[in-house]
Amino acid sequence: MSLLIERARYHLSAHNVRQLPPDEGAEVAFAGRSNAGKSSALNALTRQNALARVSKTPGRTQQLVFFQVTPEAHLVDLPGYGYAKVPLDLQAHWQAFIDKYFRTREALKGLVVVMDIRHPLKDYDRQMLSYAVQRGLPAHALLTKADKLSRSQQMQSLQKVRKELQSAYGDSVSVQVFSGEDRTGVDEARGVIGGWLGLE
């Protein structure tokens, strides 16, 4: 799996449903607040520094970006959510687009929700997790930027989030600690994603 995911390459970007690639194979989508470290997580998972653009301006990703791992397997970078500078009409467009993507996309096999370990489970995070659970999709939460906390603080946050997720979603959502800086949890996350994509 680790070698396969490192083959990820940019495939295409979609601004609306008509631009989506054929609904076949397997896809894993990545969602997260605009400053949660989603692009950095994608880069760490694929061991590529510039696969997903890391922007100084949160909310820069304004389309669904597809990265091809194999001809039958893709990673999908969803627009960062919760950023105030994105106009309301554009927010509404993305909400409708993502809603339709989740409701109709047969290739979608799992959702990774990226959350800053210091500020987990915001309303937007819960909304994305609910999308997945309602569709019967497995979801996996990455508590990113773990290197900002001590090991004991990491475990304390992990236990708290795990308890909340279990209460809200049962066994539908798993969670782990993650850091792109020191590569904490990279192999664990790759294992989850590889299983969903059929690469294991």
Curated annotation (Swiss-Prot):
Signal peptide: none annotated. GO terms for molecular function: GTP binding; metal ion binding. Gene3D superfamilies: P-loop containing nucleotide triphosphate hydrolases (3.40.50.300). PROSITE patterns: G_ENGB. Its cofactor is Mg(2+). Residues 24-199 form the EngB-type G domain. InterPro entries: G_ENGB_dom, GTP-bd, GTP-bd_ribosome_bio_YsxC, P-loop_NTPase. One of its GO terms (cellular component) is cytosol. It comes from the Bacteria. Keywords: Cell cycle, Cell division, GTP-binding, Magnesium, Metal-binding, Nucleotide-binding, Septation. GO terms for biological process: division septum assembly. GTP binds at residues 32-39, 59-63, 77-80, 144-147, 178-180. Mg(2+) binds at S39, T61. Pfam families: MMR_HSR1. Necessary for normal cell division and for the maintenance of normal septation. Belongs to the TRAFAC class TrmE-Era-EngA-EngB-Septin-like GTPase superfamily. EngB GTPase family. This is Probable GTP-binding protein EngB.
